[in-house]
């Protein structure tokens, strides 16, 4: 619709210019010719104002919701709203399995969840056995989720389950992200980062850098060189 109005405005401008030309050629013929000249000039000015307004409106509509009508995304708008696309969903705790795994009741069904973007030392691995700081990580997660009045899960933009059928999500205990809390305490590393399931990657890396700086738990001097 805007395109048609713009075309009509351009036609009006052309007609106004022609009218001004006619008025100029007849301006010496009397008072009526002068009035005609002023009228034509006013029409041209008004037309130009309308065309300018319509042009601005058309440009604004091209980037509605961060997506151009041509199909390409506006990166500025997209980056500002990308995290808002994630949303938290309610769940209830069944049990904490280990540092990075919990079992929840989700949408009326029991489901095991693997915390996204983090890896804690093992406690129940068939080959690795119990690793250093594994029990501490398990106890930390257990305390967070068992003491919470509200548990929520937040899926990212990619796949929601792994090959074992476990849900891949960020887990929140009373609004605090368990994934990030583990990393901040030096009880988990940032790991298994696969786009687009990495919305909170930078948050976790910032917490990991701080835990390293403070040499917390797996980043302590005794374990820093061992890859723990």
From Swiss-Prot:
Catalytic activity reported: Endonucleolytic cleavage to nucleoside 3'-phosphates and 3'-phosphooligonucleotide end-products
UniProt cofactor(s): Ca(2+)
GO molecular-function terms, A-Z: endonuclease activity, active with either ribo- or deoxyribonucleic acids and producing 3'-phosphomonoesters; metal ion binding; nucleic acid binding
Protein EC: 3.1.31.1
Biased composition (Polar residues): 58-70
Annotated Ca(2+) binding sites: 100, 119-120
Transmembrane segments: none
Chain spans, region Disordered: 58-83
Main localization, broad class: secreted
Propeptide: 24-60
Source organism: Staphylococcus aureus (strain COL)
Signal peptide feature range: 1-23
Cofactor note: Binds 1 Ca(2+) ion per subunit.
Cellular compartments per GO CC: extracellular region
Primary gene name: nuc
Alphabetical list of PANTHER family matching this protein: EBNA2 BINDING PROTEIN P100 (PTHR12302), SERINE_THREONINE-PROTEIN KINASE 31 (PTHR12302:SF3)
Protein name: Thermonuclease
